[in-house]
A protein has these predicted regions:
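A generic structural signal for short beta-strands and their flanking turns/coil linkers
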Residues: 42, 66, 84-88, 112-116, ...
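A generic structural motif
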Residues: 68-72, 162-163
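Short N-terminal helix-initiation segments at or just after the protein's N-terminus
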Residues: 4-10, 32-35, 53-67, 99-113, ...
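A structural signal for short, well-ordered beta-strand segments
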Residues: 61, 118-120, 162, 166
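An N-terminal domain-cap segment
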Residues: 14-69, 80
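A structural signal for short, well-ordered beta-strand segments and their strand-loop junctions
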Residues: 45-47, 91, 163-165
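C-terminal edge-of-domain segments
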Residues: 1-18, 124, 128-243
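Short, structured beta-strand-loop surface elements
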Residues: 3-4, 8, 74-135
Length: 243
């Protein structure tokens, strides 16, 4: 028999890089959970260092398989340096609730988050860049790339698309109610509660220069006012890329 078991393809191997240390039972390493947290988000934060100084850039992103993609201005310092094969850490956080406890120590937040690690690189193939730019639009608005004009040469030149293979990652979640010290429930007369937090889609405000006769495209049918943003992004992701 082999000395070690083969790596589980459905999980990220736990290492010193991705190990969840604080409240480790909240850690998640299975790819299904990590992918779900990523696919429900619109914005990520990309952390990196340039000449020993730390930076963290918020940007829209999306996932295709085990790769993450984002875009930026070709003149951006962040993009220029990421283009050199810079190690990066990509994070996503969803805030699901604010938790009021009977001590400051136990006040908390319900959340879902991901830390993903890899090396950023620029997409240089023109056809691949165009494909990804369409996917960037369709990831949020399914089918929209077929309804709008394609980017012109100046826009292509001004935009850099970055990609990163997820080399390793971990997720973390808190999804419970108030959790106080047992003696505090009876001894501390402080009102305690959990406030759910959600982002929702509102009513659309149409462009004042809309051409006459245009109606909302079929691909926007899921954009119902009051729909949770994270749930909507999961739906639009699956419509564009599948389950």
């Amino acid at each position: 028999m082999p000395d070690t078991l083969p790596a589980d393809p459905d999980r990220f191997e736990v290492s010193e890089v991705n190990r969840v240390r604080r409240v480790h039972d909240r850690g998640r390493y299975d790819k299904a959970t990590i992918h779900a947290f990523l696919d429900a988000a619109v914005v990520c934060h990309i952390a990196y260092t340039i000449d020993g100084r730390p930076y963290c850039t918020p940007t829209a992103f999306w996932r295709e398989g085990e790769h993450l993609y984002w875009h930026g201005s070709s003149a951006s310092r962040a993009i220029r340096n990421q283009n050199k094969g810079l190690p990066v850490c990509v994070t996503v956080t969803h805030v699901d609730a604010l938790v009021m406890a009977r001590s400051g120590f136990h006040h908390s937040i319900n959340y879902r988050c991901v830390m993903a690690f890899g090396t950023a690189h620029a997409i240089t193939d023109r056809a691949e860049k165009l494909r990804l730019m369409d996917n960037f639009v369709d990831r949020i608005y399914p089918g929209r790339s077929k309804l709008i004009r394609q980017p012109n040469e100046q826009e292509l030149k001004a935009t850099t698309l970055m990609g990163m293979e997820i080399e390793t990652a971990s997720g973390k979640i808190r999804d419970k109610h108030v959790a106080d010290e047992e003696e505090d429930y009876a001894a501390v007369p402080a009102w305690s509660a959990l406030y759910p937090v959600t982002q929702v889609i509102g009513e659309p405000s149409e462009c004042a220069r809309q051409l006459p006769g245009l109606t909302r495209p079929e691909g926007m049918a899921d954009f119902v006012p009051g729909t949770r943003l994270d749930e909507l992004m999961t739906v639009t992701y699956r419509k564009t890329f599948g389950a």
